[in-house]
Amino acid sequence: MRVLIDADGCPVVRETVRQCAAFHVPCLLFCDTAHVFSIPGVEVFVADCGHDSTDYLLLSHLRPGDVVITQDYGLAALCLARSAQALHPAGHAYTKDNIDALLTVRA
C-alpha cells in the first residue's frame, strides 16, 4: 500500500506526509507546475499545467490497494474503479455506495 496525494490545492499535504513517515508508508505527491513541492523523502511527480493533467499522471502510477487523497470526485471514482481506496482531505471515504451521488452534485 502507498498513499498518493492529489496535491494541487490539498490542505493536508504536510499532515499526510508526516503520518506516512511515522508509519513507514510510501507517500507520493502529484502536482502541476503551479504547485511544486519539495519534501525530503517524498517522491514528487509534476505534470504540465492543463485540464486534469495531474489526475492522469496520478492514475498512471496507481496500483490496486493504494490510497488516494483527493478533493476531486471524478478522480476518486476512477481510483475506486481501479481497486484503490480514495479519501477526501477531510477524512471521509469515497465508496461505491456514495460516489454516484457525489458525482451527481459536483459543480
Predicted regions mapped to residue ranges:
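Nuclease catalytic cores that cleave nucleic-acid phosphodiester bonds
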Residues: M1-A107
